[in-house]
Amino acid sequence: CSCADMTDKECLYFCHQDVIW
């Protein structure tokens, strides 16, 4: 996935959750 703001911890958190699951 990709986050509009790569410094957005919440976005990155859910992004990585999606990768894991």
UniProtKB/Swiss-Prot annotation:
Disulfide bonding pattern of the chain: 1-15, 3-11
GO MF term list: toxin activity
Stretches that traverse the bilayer: none
GO CC terms: extracellular region
Tissue: Expressed by the venom gland.
Residues marked Endothelin-receptor binding site (site): 21
One Pfam family linked to the record: Endothelin
Major localization listed first in the record, in broad terms: secreted
This protein's UniProt keywords: Cardiotoxin, Disulfide bond, G-protein coupled receptor impairing toxin, Secreted, Toxin, Vasoactive, Vasoconstrictor
Subcellular compartments: Secreted
Gene Ontology terms: biological process: regulation of vasoconstriction; vasoconstriction
Record's function text: Vasoconstrictor activity. These toxins cause cardiac arrest probably as a result of coronary vasospasm. May act by displaying agonistic activities towards endothelin-1 and -2 receptors (EDNRA and EDNRB).
Similarity annotation: Belongs to the endothelin/sarafotoxin family.
Protein name: Bibrotoxin
